[in-house]
């Protein structure tokens, strides 16, 4: 997966985790909703200023990490995130 596609996927996951529509995120970040759609679906090449505003709106931090520590950083991020709830399967109930 190329970097633009990975960024789009990550932003989409973060937006959904915050229960924001594309329109709501666009308003928070000060960019058009159509731009959010393109970023999420086509991996558009973002300007740093747009990426910074989107990260701020989603309460994310942009960071440059040395390549040799990327696997460790990804592992820490996975451990810190709650297990995602499937949007396609109904939740199990205890009643």
Residue ranges and their predicted role:
Residues 1-6:
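A detector for short, charged/polar N-terminal pre-domain segments
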Residues 49-65:
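DNA major-groove recognition helix of helix-turn-helix/homeodomain DNA-binding modules
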Residues 19-35:
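Short alpha-helical DNA-recognition segment
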């Amino acid at each position: 997966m190329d970097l633009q596609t990975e960024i789009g996927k990550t932003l989409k996951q973060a937006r959904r985790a915050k229960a924001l529509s594309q329109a709501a995120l666009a308003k928070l970040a000060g960019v058009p909703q159509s731009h959010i759609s393109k970023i999420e679906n086509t991996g558009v090449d973002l300007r740093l200023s747009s990426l910074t505003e989107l990260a701020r709106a989603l309460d994310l931090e942009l960071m440059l990490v040395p390549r040799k520590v990327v696997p460790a950083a990804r592992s820490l991020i996975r451990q810190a995130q709650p297990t995602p709830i499937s949007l396609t399967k109904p939740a199990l109930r205890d009643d």
